[in-house]
Amino acid sequence: CGHGHPNEATTIIEIAKTQEQHCFDGTTSAVVIAGELLKRSEELVDQNVHPTVICEGFRLASDKAVELIDTHGSGVDQKMLTEVAKTALTGKSTGAVKEFLSDISVKAVLSVAQEDAEGAMVDLDDIKVQKKQGGSIRDSTLVDGIILDKERVHSGMPRSVTNAKIALVNSAIEVKKTEVDAKIQITDPNMLSQFLDEEEQFLRNLVDKIVESGANTVICQKGIDDLAQHYMSKSGIFAIRRAKKSDMEALSKATGGRIVNNLDDLSEGDLGIASKVEERKIGDSDMVFVEGCPQAKSVSVLLRGGTEHVVDEVKRAFEDAIGVVAVAHEDGAVLTGGGSVIAALSRDLRLFAESTGGREQMAIEAFSSALEVIPRTLAENAGLDPVNTIIDLRKAHSEGKSTYGVNVYQGGVVDMAKAKVFEPSRVVEQAIQSASETAVMILRIDD
């Protein structure tokens, strides 16, 4: 059963990816358990246990573990979700503002969650996470709506509009150049002023159309002529130009407005609504906030931080946190962390192995002890003696203290429920399944 197969490395990389996709966490666990299962399977092969029997035992053990995970879980409320977020943020450079960021992440997830009879569904695309260097992390905000990295086109325009009626325009608000780029022969000064008057009148008409529709806010995907800007500001209209296509679509969804390609077609029915559109100074630049959108399925989070590096770190940590909170909210169950549940499952599987006859029993026992690689690794990372830690952990679990695990930050075996270290059950479930499937696949290759 000589390992070192070229496919093994790629397979292990694959499980890491699957784990990341499904759970945003626990990638290391999946890979570490898979490696340990392979080590144990070699020992079994040396004792003349056939790979097919090992595969069957691993499968039985994995299924049993997944079935038993629920017995170790507890229900989820908002407070519990905050603890899950805090656990995800622990040990990252955002440590000091953990409480603050975990609150924002839970609020963001709960405001986009769709609830139905079967439970909750969270689409993380509905949380737009933006970062802006400057200020401190505590200046980060959650906005019920959309943030545009833009400023109004003319300083004479209002900085803020309440009860915004928004025209979403996908054409330039400027004079259309004559189709044939003819040099217009202007021989007489009167002709020039007449020509300019016509341009002016054309732009004035365009702005009148906007005013007639009832719009007081214009978000334009293309350019806006200087003169048109001037007329708009005279009419008290707030306007942005060159908005991103993705922002236009998000605005359309949130405000209920329709994107029009031609101002001639603009009518009141096309307008989107928001309770407020406002330009605010964020750091060194201005950004526009569109808030209180009636159909907003999405929220925006603006993350701040003193340097580029800090903002990037905060964004990475925050995205992990919302990912894990979303999973916990969808599953409606969380587990205590620190390897506590893995240790409990290891004990459960030892008992399960005793009730199983046949040679699979050895494989289930091997699976049970392979799981202990997780608390062992945690102990090593915390600078604790791994052997003593496992002994302490087994002792605690044999006394029914099934929430005891390894606390990396305080060092030692403690009650993880008291230490408030929690993770979604899906993370542990997926890690065990992925590890088992990978080990079985590689055993088959070598069989």
Regions picked out by a protein language model, each given a short descriptive name:
Residues 1-36:
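N-terminal cofactor/phosphate-binding cores enriched in small/glycine residues
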Residues 4-6, 298-302, 306-447:
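Extended, low-charge hydrophobic alpha-helical regions
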Residues 9, 20, 56, 68, ...:
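Metallocofactor- and cofactor-centric catalytic cores in central/energy metabolism, strongly enriched
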Residues 21-30, 43, 47-61, 65:
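Hydrophobic, well-structured modules enriched for small/aliphatic residues and gly/pro motifs
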Residues 27, 31-32, 52-59, 361-369, ...:
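Alpha-helical transmembrane segments of multi-pass membrane proteins, especially transporters
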Residues 60-306, 313:
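Extended amphipathic alpha-helical scaffolds
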